[in-house]
């Protein structure tokens, strides 16, 4: 029995990677220094895993921006616009072209601007990947040299590595056809490209993982989380031929297919018969897969000698594992198959967890005992394996007993349960989940109150967090700035943001959120039942890192959280001022949520706390209140069987939070990049007066679903991408607005950026918003002509 890990956080315990990459972008860090810091982090992370008890460490999970983008580059699937010549670029033989990589990720400004690749959520997580673009003429130019170099780094340093790549069917499933062609028509060529990559890996790296199954060569982990989806039979049927082709290309390699995030369920028979050596199953989110797999393999069916990797430590949450429960699962497999056919692992890549609990110095000691970050999860994997083996010393016995005691203490802690919250939940009635009047009546009252033009302009909420704002926040934390002085600095920043918006000519203003470090962490610091880490960072996309709060107990609102800031902003302008809150679903999705009660109960607790805040904002004179739910779609379970219950709980929680206001108060919500086709009826059921959406990278394609389904309320499709520093032209945004106006009634359209502007700089923000306002003016004039 061996231990391994599917992936490790790449950002560094102190966000060293973020700082190095952003320094490179700004010209303060050389390429040599950037590559040196990346190599140092890789070595540090491999050592952390090995020292915690991981036998085989992942290589290829590290990326300067995104692992899907790295694979796209290794495949040579470069869209023509990223090549100076206009022809498809090929990095073959040159190693990783990091400037090309960053251009694909961020786009390029200048005289010949280039739009970046589209970005969207990685399955149901808060990680974002860059979507490969394909067309009928896409040709592959495979080059594994970047990954070969990393494997050699690991081997030279004495680690036992396994190469990690997204699998071919997952990569193709997640790609986007830009010309309407069938992307699966490229599968034969893609298989050839993968075969070339695998041959390059195995020929360049000596055997590193002998283990007596069917081969003893380099171990390669091919991630196929699409096996956790409700796949069409046509796609499911592709797996055997694809993996037969890959096995033939590298007969001596140790191939592992890894599925995670949900049960394999009806895809399990296909997975168990693939010509590979190891199959990884997520037993945290798909526990029933183990019984089904053991039944098949125990009957002598499936791939002969197939080993199972059992993901028994939760790779997506931070609570200590139930070691006894994990041991029972692994022991059942070992008893059925033999220990030599069982691997122990986290459920998925630890990319979604903070790096090291040891970095926390100020965390509440009681809550800290309940936690395990990535480094500690590797130790939990080792502990499970040692207990199952049954031969261990006093240290392992002590660790096992400590785990049991922590779980006992957490279950009875008075920090967890608040009787007042339970009583209030019990008093909720169904009428609290519905607005007083239907939208058709509300919009009349709102238009009379707000006096807005056709195509009103606004922003999503946040404005650039300048060095002065960040410095003030740091000074408050370290005690060198008093609370009064900090609040004065934030009021000054807020007033400046209001003046900027008035000068730009925006119709509905926001206060800009200078006081907020993060849209979820901020509220986690003010709600009872949460605690905040100092270094619990996880990667959201590229260099964007977030610090999810820890939701450990019953949730309530001790006092108003945002009212003073929004009310002050309202006092500075005669224009409508929009208040911003983060919705219950997003707070839950972007926090590390307790695992001892149902998610529905957590959502309703959050909704009641936010309901109080919405009511106080309305009482303070805020006529527009936005409750953001960018995570609603990403939280959707991957399997259809679980989706209805989730959506019902999510929509009811949103309505519970927002339905206590008068007809004239306009409720907005905001959502990020996602596929709305399968949930559009539920989005309509949220009954927000206005929904703003990320739409620019998809060229307004997502509006088609709103038109097809007759979405009844108002929509603000984003007209420019805030994830790139590029400033789009007036013509570009005008074209997008005209496209939107051709799909939806113009009297129900708003004009806004894709998302908040927190991560941008002021010069590009001013320029882009000025162009946006001018684009709206032009379209109004054209429509009035």
From Swiss-Prot:
Residue positions of the active site: 723 (proton donor)
SUPFAM superfamilies: UROD/MetE-like (SSF51726)
Keywords recorded for this protein, A-Z: Amino-acid biosynthesis, Metal-binding, Methionine biosynthesis, Methyltransferase, Repeat, Transferase, Zinc
EC number(s) reported in the record: 2.1.1.14
BP terms from Gene Ontology: methionine biosynthetic process; methylation
Pfam families for this protein: Meth_synt_1, Meth_synt_2
Pathway assigned in UniProt: Amino-acid biosynthesis; L-methionine biosynthesis via de novo pathway; L-methionine from L-homocysteine (MetE route): step 1/1
Residues that coordinate or bind 5-methyltetrahydropteroyltri-L-glutamate: 15-18, 121, 544-545, 590, 634
Any one GO MF annotation of this record: 5-methyltetrahydropteroyltriglutamate-homocysteine S-methyltransferase activity
Cofactor(s) this protein requires: Zn(2+)
Cofactor note text: Binds 1 zinc ion per subunit.
Residue sites binding Zn(2+) per the record: 670, 672, 694, 755
Catalytic activity: 5-methyltetrahydropteroyltri-L-glutamate + L-homocysteine = tetrahydropteroyltri-L-glutamate + L-methionine
Entry binding sites for L-homocysteine: 460-462, 513, 628
Residues the entry annotates as binding L-methionine: 460-462, 513, 628
Family the UniProt entry places it in: Belongs to the vitamin-B12 independent methionine synthase family.
HAMAP family registered for this protein in UniProt: Meth_synth
Its job: Catalyzes the transfer of a methyl group from 5-methyltetrahydrofolate to homocysteine resulting in methionine formation.
Protein name as it appears in the record: 5-methyltetrahydropteroyltriglutamate--homocysteine methyltransferase
Species: Nitratidesulfovibrio vulgaris (strain ATCC 29579 / DSM 644 / CCUG 34227 / NCIMB 8303 / VKM B-1760 / Hildenborough) (Desulfovibrio vulgaris)
């Amino acid at each position: 029995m061996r231990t391994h890990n599917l992936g490790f956080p790449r950002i560094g315990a102190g966000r060293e990677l973020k700082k190095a990459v952003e320094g490179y972008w700004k010209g303060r860090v050389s390429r040599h220094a950037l590559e040196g810091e990346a190599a140092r982090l890789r070595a540090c992370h491999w050592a952390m895993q090995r020292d915690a008890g991981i036998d085989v460490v992942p290589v290829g999970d590290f990326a300067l921006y995104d692992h899907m983008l790295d694979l796209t580059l290794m495949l040579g699937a470069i869209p023509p616009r990223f090549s100076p010549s206009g022809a498809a670029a090929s990095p073959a033989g040159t190693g990783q072209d990091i400037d090309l990589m960053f251009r694909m990720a961020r786009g390029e400004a200048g005289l010949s601007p280039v739009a970046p690749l589209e970005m969207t959520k990685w399955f149901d997580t808060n990680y974002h990947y860059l979507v490969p673009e394909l067309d009928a003429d896409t040709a592959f130019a495979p080059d594994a040299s970047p990954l070969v170099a990393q494997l050699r780094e690991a081997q030279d340093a004495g680690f036992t590595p396994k190469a990690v790549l997204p699998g071919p069917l997952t990569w193709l499933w997640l790609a986007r056809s830009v010309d309407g062609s069938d992307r699966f028509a490229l599968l034969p060529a893609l298989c050839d490209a993968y075969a070339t990559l695998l041959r390059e890996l195995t020929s360049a790296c000596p055997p590193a993982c002998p283990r007596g199954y069917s081969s003893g060569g380099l171990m390669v982990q091919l991630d196929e989380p699409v096996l956790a989806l409700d796949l069409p039979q046509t796609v499911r049927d592709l797996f055997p031929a694809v993996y037969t082709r890959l096995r033939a290309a590298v007969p001596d390699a140790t191939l592992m297919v890894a599925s995670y995030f949900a049960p394999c369920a009806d895809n399990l028979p296909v997975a168990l018969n693939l010509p590979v050596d190891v199959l990884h199953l997520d037993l945290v989110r798909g526990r029933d897969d183990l019984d089904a797999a053991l039944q098949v393999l125990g009957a002598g069916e499936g791939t002969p000698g197939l080993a199972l990797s059992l993901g028994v430590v939760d790779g997506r949450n931070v609570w200590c594992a139930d070691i006894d429960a994990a041991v029972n699962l692994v022991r059942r497999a070992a008893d059925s198959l033999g220990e030599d056919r069982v691997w122990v692992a986290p459920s998925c890549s630890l990319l979604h967890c903070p790096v090291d609990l040891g970095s926390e110095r100020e965390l509440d000691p009681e809550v800290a005992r309940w936690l395990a970050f990535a480094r500690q999860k590797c130790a939990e994997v080792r502990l499970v394996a040692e207990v199952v083996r049954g031969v261990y010393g006093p240290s392992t016995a002590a660790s096992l007993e400590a785990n049991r005691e922590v779980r006992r203490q957490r279950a009875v802690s008075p920090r967890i349960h608040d009787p007042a919250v339970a009583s209030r939940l019990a008093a909720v009635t169904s009428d609290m989940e519905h607005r007083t009047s239907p939208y058709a009546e509300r919009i009349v009252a709102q238009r009379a109150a707000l006096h807005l033009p056709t195509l009103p302009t606004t922003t999503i909420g946040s404005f650039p967090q300048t060095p002065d704002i960040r410095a003030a926040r740091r000074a408050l934390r370290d005690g060198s700035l008093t609370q009064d002085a900090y609040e004065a600095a934030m009021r000054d920043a807020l007033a400046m943001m209001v003046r900027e918006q008035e000068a730009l000519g925006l119709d509905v203003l926001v206060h800009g959120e200078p006081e907020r470090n993060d849209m979820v962490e901020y509220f986690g610091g003010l709600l009872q039942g949460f605690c905040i880490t100092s270094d619990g960072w996880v990667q959201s996309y590229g260099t964007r890192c977030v610090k999810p709060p820890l939701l450990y107990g019953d949730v309530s609102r001790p006092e108003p959280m945002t009212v003073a800031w929004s009310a002050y902003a309202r006092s500075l302008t005669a224009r409508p001022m929009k208040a911003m809150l983060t919705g219950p679903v997003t707070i839950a999705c972007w926090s590390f949520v307790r695992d001892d009660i149902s998610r529905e109960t957590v959502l309703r607790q959050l909704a009641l706390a936010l309901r109080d805040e919405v009511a106080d904002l309305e009482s303070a004179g805020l006529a527009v209140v936005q409750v953001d739910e960018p995570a609603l779609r990403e939280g959707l379970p991957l399997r259809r069987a679980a989706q209805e219950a989730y959506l019902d709980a999510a929509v009811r929680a949103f309505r519970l939070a927002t339905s206590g206001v008068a007809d004239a108060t306009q409720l907005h919500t905001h959502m990020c990049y996602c596929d709305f086709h399968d949930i559009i009826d539920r989005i309509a059921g949220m009954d927000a007066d206005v929904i703003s959406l990320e739409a620019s990278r998809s060229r307004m394609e997502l509006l088609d679903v709103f038109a097809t389904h007759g979405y009844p309320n108002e929509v603000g499709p984003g007209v420019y991408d805030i994830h790139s520093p590029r400033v789009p032209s007036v013509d570009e945004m005008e074209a997008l607005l005209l496209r939107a106006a051709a799909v939806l009634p113009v009297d129900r359209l708003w004009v806004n950026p894709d998302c908040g502007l927190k991560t941008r700089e002021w010069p590009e923000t001013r320029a882009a918003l000025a162009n946006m306002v001018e684009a709206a003016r032009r379209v109004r004039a054209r429509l009035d002509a």
